[in-house]
Amino acid sequence: MVSRQEQFEQVQAVKKSINTASEEVKNQVLLAMADHLVAATEEILAANALDMAAAKGKISDVMLDRLYLDADRIEAMARGIREVVALPDPIGEVLETSQLENGLVITKKRVAMGVIGIIYESRPNVTSDAAALTLKSGNAVVLRSGKDAYQTTHAIVTALKKGLETTTIHPNVIQLVEDTSRESSYAMMKAKGYLDLLIPRGGADLINAVVENAIVPVIETGTGIVHVYVDKDADDDKALSIINNAKTSRPSVCNAMEVLLVHEDKAASFLPRLEQVLVADRKEAGLEPIQFRLDSKASQFVSGQAAQAQDFDTEFLDYILAVKVVSSLEEAVAHIESHSTHHSDAIVTENAEAAAYFTDQVDSAAVYVNASTRFTDGGQFGLGCEMGISTQKLHARGPMGLKELTSYKYVVTGDGQIRE
């Protein structure tokens, strides 16, 4: 096993090859990686079977689905890499140019970060997405996968590096930390001088540990306690469709809805219809029904467990939905501001003034009017695959694509000027 220190030194030694690579070279790299990923399908599936067998019974079925790969999912991962090829190269983009009175020309241009570290949990697709985005944005990358997905991740990285071996870029621009202990995560958090940026992707415990302990600059990809508020002026059919999609299409992802707020004027008519869609109809279709966690008012209209205070601060990542009845738009916004992780929140309403108030007052990375929160995604936003959803405000906010993985520098051109 190569030590972490050796890996940090290896990636530092070769980072310039990707930091300054042309768009043509980087695209060749990505295409080779995609081809070798598909070519290694058999090996990746064998590794994934080992991870699945080890994880079964230890994590929920929803989380197992995150971990699971088949040939179609591997092809989708390769397709995601190829989609990044089609995106414009951000490196070298001129952001601003100005000329001073003394004749100096100052150009602000986009440059690579250098080396980016990614700590993530059991999602194999993050491996290929992270590699594609970091390399296309001119960065080398150090990956640290969760233990549950390590065999799969190792097989994926092996395939990607075989692709790199067919290009002019050194395979060491991608490093996979082989040690999946907590110590390896903490080593990355302290790797100042080796990592220029650290991005955690996972649950609240992982993200909080990185944010609280890292001395390397961090972009926080926060958890998603995502709200949908059904206003008194909502279209009921529209609201039912949005909630069904936001909660059930993929409950294990961070843009899935976790909390429903319903105006009290709507509760009596709307909540029984929602129960029909999310519980009865799903049972009839052989699908897992939604389990409600209800406040005292909501429990008057539908069946479910009584909500505990922590239910409104929980990212369930499962077929569970916390429901609260509110007396006004203002109460809904106040609840969101008290409990939100500032990821994605939505209002369903036909009232333009209510929509404007909601979008002005809710301080989240993505705020929706009459649409599912499941659209908070780099691909859906036209950014290609994403590095994560930033819930902080400095440097990057919302889905992080190529530009969010870059910095800038000033190039000052003169003709012998000196400062008096």
From Swiss-Prot:
<dbReference type="GO" id="GO:0050661">
    <property type="term" value="F:NADP binding"/>
</dbReference>
<dbReference type="GO" id="GO:0004350">
    <property type="term" value="F:glutamate-5-semialdehyde dehydrogenase activity"/>
</dbReference>
<keyword id="KW-0641">Proline biosynthesis</keyword>
<dbReference type="InterPro" id="IPR012134">
    <property type="entry name" value="Glu-5-SA_DH"/>
</dbReference>
<keyword id="KW-0560">Oxidoreductase</keyword>
<keyword id="KW-0521">NADP</keyword>
<dbReference type="GO" id="GO:0005737">
    <property type="term" value="C:cytoplasm"/>
</dbReference>
<dbReference type="InterPro" id="IPR015590">
    <property type="entry name" value="Aldehyde_DH_dom"/>
</dbReference>
<protein>
    <recommendedName>
        <fullName>Gamma-glutamyl phosphate reductase</fullName>
        <ecNumber>1.2.1.41</ecNumber>
    </recommendedName>
</protein>
<dbReference type="InterPro" id="IPR016163">
    <property type="entry name" value="Ald_DH_C"/>
</dbReference>
<comment type="function">
    <text>Catalyzes the NADPH-dependent reduction of L-glutamate 5-phosphate into L-glutamate 5-semialdehyde and phosphate. The product spontaneously undergoes cyclization to form 1-pyrroline-5-carboxylate.</text>
</comment>
<dbReference type="InterPro" id="IPR016162">
    <property type="entry name" value="Ald_DH_N"/>
</dbReference>
<comment type="pathway">
    <text>Amino-acid biosynthesis; L-proline biosynthesis; L-glutamate 5-semialdehyde from L-glutamate: step 2/2.</text>
</comment>
<keyword id="KW-0963">Cytoplasm</keyword>
<dbReference type="InterPro" id="IPR016161">
    <property type="entry name" value="Ald_DH/histidinol_DH"/>
</dbReference>
<dbReference type="Pfam" id="PF00171">
    <property type="entry name" value="Aldedh"/>
</dbReference>
<dbReference type="InterPro" id="IPR020593">
    <property type="entry name" value="G-glutamylP_reductase_CS"/>
</dbReference>
<dbReference type="GO" id="GO:0055129">
    <property type="term" value="P:L-proline biosynthetic process"/>
</dbReference>
<keyword id="KW-0028">Amino-acid biosynthesis</keyword>
<comment type="similarity">
    <text>Belongs to the gamma-glutamyl phosphate reductase family.</text>
</comment>
<dbReference type="InterPro" id="IPR000965">
    <property type="entry name" value="GPR_dom"/>
</dbReference>
